[in-house]
Amino acid sequence: MFYQENFDVIVVGGGHAGTEAALAAARMGQKTLLLTHNIDTLGQMSCNPAIGGIGKGHLVKEVDALGGLMAKATDKGGIQFRTLNSSKGPAVRATRAQADRALYKAAVREVLENQPNLMLFQQAVDDLIVENDRVIGVVTEMGLKFRATSVVLTVGTFLGGKIHIGLENYSGGRAGDPPSIALASRLRELPFRVDRLKTGTPPRIDARTVDFSRLQAQHGDNPIPTFSFMGKTSDHPRQIPCYITYTNEKTHDVIRNNLDRSPMYSGVIEGIGPRYCPSIEDKVMRFADKNSHQIFIEPEGLTTHELYPNGISTSLPFDVQIQIVRSMDGFENAAIMRPGYAIEYDFFDPRDLKQTFETKFIDGLFFAGQINGTTGYEEAAAQGLLAGMNAALQSQGKEGWCPRRDQAYMGVLIDDLSTMGTKEPYRMFTSRAEYRLLLREDNADLRLTEIGREFGLVDDDRWARFNQKVENIEQERQRLKDIWINPNSDHVDEINKILKTPIAREANGEDLLRRPEITYKLLTQLEDFSPAHIDTQASEQVEIQVKYQGYIDRQKDEVEKSLRHETTKLPFDLEYSIVKGLSNEVIAKLTDAKPETIGMASRISGITPAAISLLLVYLKKHGMLKKGE
C-alpha cells in the first residue's frame, strides 16, 4: 500500500549524512521524510567518539555556516576541545572535539524531532520505485510505499554489509544492526558501477581495568573553543582528558604471529580499507621499522566506563585482541567490553554522480556519505547537507548548486569524487585544496552563510548574528585605518617598546598589525588603539585579514584567472569521438567520466591542456559557449 501523504524529499538512513540531508530539505520548506531502520540510532557515532581534525574540522565549520547541525551537536556533546596546528598559519588550524556519544546523539535527536516539515519513520527500505529512469518513491521492508519527488540514499556501511572478526564473518550493517541486503541487490540492478570497501573499529575497553597512572594525560585547550559560529562555552558539558599509550615489540610480535588468522592477510576481505586510518596489523606490516605506534585513549562519555583506543582498529580474532590490548603499558589487566571488527560494504563509483550528488542515470536519486566511497562523519555530513539541499531545489523545480573548489572544502570534496572517483575510502585533508588560505575554518561563515540564506538554509538568528559580525569586522578595520601614529606622537615610546624596529614614518593601526611581532590583542592594549569592543570571532578575522591580505589577494587573483572556463558546461551526451584532434585515450577517458564542465574535464588524469583547447574550439564552433567565455 501507498502511504496516504506524498513527500517532496525522502531521505533513507539516519546517520551523519542522512540527518543533515533531512534537516536541510526541511529547513528549505520541503515536506521531508527521514526513514531509518531504528530511530534510537539517529546520529549515532559508529566509530570513534570525535568530530573534526585537519580538513575535517573545516568541513564541519562549512556545514555549520550553511545552517547544519553537526557543530552545534558537538558543542552540546563535546567533552574535550582542541585546536590542532595552533602554532601554524590560519589555513591549517583545525578544531577537534571528543564527544560524549550519548549527549551527541541526544542533541541530534532533539533537533530532528522539533524540525518543522520533517517526519521521522522507523522502517528499513528494501526497494526504490523507478519509472522512466526517474525515482518516484521507496518501498519499506513491510511493503509500505512512500512517494516523493526526490530520494536521498545515505545508507553508510549497510549495503551488503559483512562483519569480520578473525576468520568468522556474518552479515551486518554495523555491530548490532542488520545489513541492507535487498536494497543492495536492487541498486546493483541499476546502471551504476559498484565495488567493495572496508573499514574497521578497535575493541572497546573497560576504564575500570586500566592503570591510568602509567598513561600520559592529554588535556583540552583553555579557553575552550566552540565548534559552531553560534556556539558558546556554556553549551559544553564537563571537560575531561584523553590519554596516550603506545604499542611495543610484544604487541607487534603478537600481531605478526597471528597474521594467518587475519581476514585481511588471508584473503577473506577483498575490500580496500582507509589509507589514513589503517588497522593495527596493517601498520605493523607496512611500517616494520617502527618499534611502537602511538595510541590515543578516548573516553566514550561522561557516564560510561567505555574507552575507545584510537589506533588499534583490528579484525583479528578475539583471543588475539585480548593479547594485543594487554601488551600495552597500563592495559596489562584490561577487559574488553566490545570486540573490534572489520566491515565490508558496497559503494558506488562517485563518477556516476553530478556535482549536485544526483545520479547521472536515475533522475531525482541522490547519494551521500559512505555510499560514495568516503570515510568519516564530517565528509558524510557535508555531502548530506548538499544532497538534501539539491534534492529540495529539484522538488522546487530549481537548478541545483554546489560550491566551487575555491569556495569551500565541500566543493573540493564533490569535485574530487565526481571527477576522479576513488578506489579507497576518501578522507578530506587541507592538502587537497589549491586555495587553502581562502578556505580557512575561521571564515567559513563569511564564505557560505549568505549563500545559505539565499537558499533558505539559514534561520533568522544565525543571519542576524552573521550580519553583526560582518559589521563589527568592517567597523574595526576602519577604526584601525583611521588611527595614525608618527615618530612624534604622544605615545610613540609605548608603541616602540613592543616593536622590533621603531616607527620611522607615519603608520596607521593596520600598518602596525601587519608587523609579525604585533598581535591584535597586543595592539588594542596600547592607549591609542584601545578599547576594542568586538568579540573573539570578529577580532580573529580582523587580524587574519590584515596580516595575510597580500597573500589572500594573490590567491583571489589566481582564482579569477582559473574561473574563466571552470564552469563552462559540457553537454552530457557530447560525442567526444567527433571532436577533431582528440586522441583515442582522451576520447575514452572523457566518454567514461562524462564531465559536466571544462573545469572537471581538466582535472581528469591524462586530459592535457591541448585537449581542453580542442574542446573549447568545438564548443565555440557549435555555439555552445556563452558570451565572454
From Swiss-Prot:
Swiss-Prot/TrEMBL keywords: Cytoplasm, FAD, Flavoprotein, NAD, tRNA processing
Domain of life: Bacteria
Gene Ontology annotations of biological process type: tRNA methylation; tRNA wobble uridine modification
Binding site for NAD(+): 273-287
Entry's localization field: Cytoplasm
Predominant cellular place of this UniProt entry's protein: cytoplasm
A Pfam cross-reference name: GIDA_C_1st
Cofactor(s) annotated in UniProt: FAD
Molecular functions (GO terms): flavin adenine dinucleotide binding
Residues that coordinate or bind FAD: 13-18, 125, 180, 370
GO cellular component, one term: cytosol
InterPro entries registered for this protein in UniProt: FAD/NAD-bd_sf, GIDA_C_N, MnmG, MnmG-rel, MnmG-rel_CS, MnmG_C, MnmG_C_subdom, MnmG_C_subdom_sf
Family classification: Belongs to the MnmG family.
Record's subunit section: Homodimer. Heterotetramer of two MnmE and two MnmG subunits.
Function: NAD-binding protein involved in the addition of a carboxymethylaminomethyl (cmnm) group at the wobble position (U34) of certain tRNAs, forming tRNA-cmnm(5)s(2)U34.
UniProt name for this protein: tRNA uridine 5-carboxymethylaminomethyl modification enzyme MnmG
